[in-house]
Curated annotation (Swiss-Prot):
Cofactor(s) recorded in Swiss-Prot or TrEMBL: Mn(2+)
Protein name: Polymerase acidic protein
Any GO BP: cap snatching
Name of the encoding gene: PA
Family of this protein: Belongs to the influenza viruses PA family.
UniProt short sequence motif Nuclear localization signal 1 (NLS1), positions renumbered to this chain: 124-139
Upper taxonomic lineage: Viruses, Riboviria, Orthornavirae, Negarnaviricota, Polyploviricotina
One Pfam family it belongs to: Flu_PA
MF (Gene Ontology): endonuclease activity; metal ion binding; RNA binding
Chain location of the short sequence motif Nuclear localization signal 2 (NLS2) per the record: 184-247
Subunit structure: Influenza RNA polymerase is composed of three subunits: PB1, PB2 and PA. Interacts (via C-terminus) with PB1 (via N-terminus).
Natural source organism: Influenza A virus (strain A/Udorn/307/1972 H3N2)
InterPro entries: INFV_PA, PA/PA-X, PA/PA-X_sf
Enzyme Commission number(s): 3.1.-.-
Length: 716
């Protein structure tokens, strides 16, 4: 239908219809029949006016386009097709100069010969039904109604048809042609059935009696009755004279609306300072797995058993030593903690029966690393009332950090494919109704695109770690429990695989409130040398713990194996959300689904199959300094998933604030791109609100950098 409209109607009419739909928040790609109806109505209004002039004697004459008498006065003033502000301005001007009564609703034309407003109707139904609806809505003697149908019928107030027979015949012929063209393309039935009646719901609710008196009493100042207020609201333009409206509201409010032009926005200012550091709860692209395929050992599925089995697959252990110290920590304690883990795992192996869980000995190094006895003593406030200089302790402002390239690399890596399958088909949920056949198909296509994705690995890793940590926090509150960091996947051939990333040691965890913190020490394997990007690993103490033999195209090579150790903390509420990271799959699937829906409504059939199977088509993925990046539909799926996963991994107040505030600026820029002529006040205040969220969070800084790329290319 959209293609038909663009071919059938004058481009100026199409542009006006697009503008009208955008003004009312309607999507022409979805509401295609409405798009066609608006274009038809606009064209009939213009045809009604065409060639009709008033001569010097005040008589109505018809003049063809090539006639030299172009200085004659147009008989009709066209109101339809203007934006609401301008349309009401024209109506008010006509009323002031002619003395005509102001209509309650915007009419389509004004007839200078008959001195009356005209409402034009074009209907796919019976003309008399549509006429009655219009008359019931307008409820005005002063607006003349003229209805045309696609079958050649017409109806007008008091059978006064205003125009000569030839002009009306031209309109009827055009409508009949549009109908024939639609029918030839199989569009007419859908178009005919889609017409809705005029909205008259408010007219049916007459307010009487006590409610009417209350309504009249509760009006804003300067309004004598409800009718006056209604008329004012109907004529009120949300985009017009906001300054005046604000100043009426309050003496303190003073806002000047500035036009928002292509040259108005400036880039968001990113902070200067040392580079930002890695702050996720576990390693992402730098993680290394010790894996076993087709596990069938005794106790398979018990984390500690699986961990010991994975540890046995590696033979390159060596005496550990520190290669990158933590600047503020007691680094020997981190080294001793790892040695203690190795020793206690060895002790377990020497036992006849391996226990299901392992509680670590409460050594001095672990007490230090887990902050045991470090919390300040809590004192009841009532016991402190008499202390004269009681005050909240001073806390330092967080140090500003600059964007670093590692976070973009992390994101790129999260979008990539791995050689393992991380989710089974049912991770997103089973069907619950027969109507979900299309939903199943979409889910299966989507799952196929993301099941190998590294972001999906992060989801399963996050779910496992948070579930294990929350369980241990509740079941062993006083113990320093050793928790293996494990994930499960399948190889391309379908063989099961169990992976060990490292270990967590949990501190004391008497978690009464959702926000109470449990400390933990994480120890994670990696092949990444921390000395290459030391700023990324500011919070870590990194040990070299072994040498790993790797097969490559040129044969075997030995690489040092590192252990990234750090103290960290989390809370019940954070673990609860971490356990639900599978929601990221659902969120990104819904985003893809809205893209499919938009495409399907244009083509007027379900486009799921074509959407996923047309490998030649590319889609916009995001903005970069080079411009709009495009890729396959699979790449779009994986990018959307990675964004959702990173929003979960790097969740923070800074991200919440930046997302909420930058969205406002985004909406204004989009309005500018849609030629809606937006206006703003206190744009500086909005920039301030955005930039106060840019402190030190790597994911927020990267999003701000992307936003700047978007601004650059959107406003060219």
């Amino acid at each position: 239908m959209e293609d038909f409209v663009r071919q059938c109607f004058n481009p100026m009419i199409v542009e006006l219809a697009e503008k009208a739909m955008k003004e009312y928040g309607e999507d022409l790609k979805i509401e295609t029949n409405k798009f066609a109806a608006i274009c038809t109505h606009l064209e009939i209004c213009f045809m009604y006016s065409d060639f009709h002039f008033i001569n010097e004697q005040g008589e109505s004459i018809v003049v063809e386009l090539d006639d030299p008498n172009a200085l004659l006065k147009h008989r009709f003033e066209i109101i339809e097709g203007r934006d609401r502000t301008m349309a009401w301005t024209v109506v008010n001007s006509i009323c002031n100069t002619t003395g005509a009564e102001k209509p309650k609703f915007l009419p389509d034309l004004y007839d200078y010969k008959e001195n009356r407003f005209i409402e034009i109707g074009v209907t796919r139904r019976e003309v008399h039904i549509y006429y009655l609806e219009k008359a019931n809505k307008i409820k005005s003697e002063n607006t003349h109604i003229h209805i045309f149908s696609f079958t050649g019928e017409e109806m007008a107030t008091k059978a006064d048809y205003t125009l000569d027979d030839e002009s009306r015949a031209r309109i009827k012929t055009r409508l009949f042609t549009i109908r024939q063209e639609m029918a030839n393309r199989g569009l007419w039935d859908s178009f005919r059935q889609s017409e809705r009646g005029e909205e008259t719901i408010e007219e049916r609710f007459e307010i009487t009696g006590t409610m009417r008196r209350l309504a009249d009493q509760s009006l804003p100042p300067n309004f004598s009755c409800l009718e006056n207020f209604r008329a004012y609201v109907d004529g009120f333009e949300p985009n017009g004279c906001i300054e005046g409206k604000l100043s009426q509201m309050s003496k303190e409010v003073n806002a000047r609306i500035e036009p928002f032009l292509k040259t108005t926005p400036r880039p968001i200012k990113l902070p200067d300072g040392p580079p930002c550091f890695q702050r996720s709860k576990f390693l992402l692209m730098d993680a290394l797995k010790l894996s076993i395929e087709d596990p069938s050992h005794e106790g398979e599925g018990i984390p500690l058993y699986d961990a010991i089995k994975c540890m046995r697959t590696f033979f390159g252990w060596k005496e550990p030593y520190i290669v990158k110290p933590h600047e503020k920590g007691i680094n020997p304690n981190y080294l001793l903690s790892w040695k203690q883990v190795l020793a206690e795992l060895q002790d377990i192996e020497n036992e006849e029966k391996i226990p299901r869980t392992k509680n670590m000995k409460k050594t001095s190094q672990l007490k230090w690393a887990l902050g045991e006895n470090m919390a300040p003593e809590k004192v009841d406030f009532d016991n402190c009332r008499d202390i004269s200089d009681l005050k909240q302790y001073d806390s330092d402002e967080p140090e500003l950090r600059s964007l670093s390239s590692w976070i973009q690399n992390e994101f790129n890596k999260a979008c990539e494919l791995t050689d393992s399958i991380w989710i089974e088909l049912d991770e997103i949920g089973e069907d619950v109704a027969p109507i979900e056949y299309i939903a199943s198909m979409r889910r299966n296509y989507f799952t196929a695109e993301v099941s190998h994705c590294r972001a999906t690995e992060y989801i399963m890793k996050g779910v496992y770690i948070n579930t294990a940590l929350l369980n241990a926090s509740c079941a062993a509150m006083d113990d320093f429990q050793l928790i293996p960091m494990i994930s499960k996947c399948r190889t391309k051939e379908g063989r099961r695989k169990t992976n060990l990333y490292g270990f967590i040691i949990k501190g004391r965890s008497h978690l009464r409130n959702d926000t109470d913190v449990v400390n933990f020490v994480s120890m994670e394997f990696s092949l990444t040398d921390p000395r290459l990007e030391p700023h990324k690993w500011e919070k870590y103490c990194v040990l070299e713990i072994g040498d790993m033999l790797l097969r490559s195209a040129i044969g075997q090579m030995s690489r040092p194996m590192f252990l990234y150790v750090r103290t960290n903390g989390t809370s019940k509420i954070k673990m609860k959300w971490g356990m639900e990271m599978r929601r990221c799959l659902l969120q990104s699937l819904q985003q893809i689904e809205s893209m499919i829906e938009a495409e399907s409504s244009v083509k007027e059939k379900d486009m799921t199959k074509e959407f996923f199977e047309n490998k030649s088509e590319t889609w916009p993925i995001g903005e970069s300094p080079k411009g709009v990046e495009e890729g396959s539909i699979g790449k779009v799926c994986r990018t959307l998933l990675a964004k959702s996963v990173f929003n979960s991994l790097y969740a923070s107040p800074q991200l919440e604030g930046f997302s909420a505030e930058s969205r406002k600026l985004l909406l204004v820029v989009q309005a500018l791109r849609d030629n809606l002529e937006p206006g703003t006040f206190d744009l500086g205040g909005l920039y301030e609100a955005i930039e106060e969220c840019l402190i030190n969070d790597p994911w927020v800084l990267l999003n701000a950098s992307w936003f700047n790329s978007f601004l650059t290319h959107a406003l060219r």
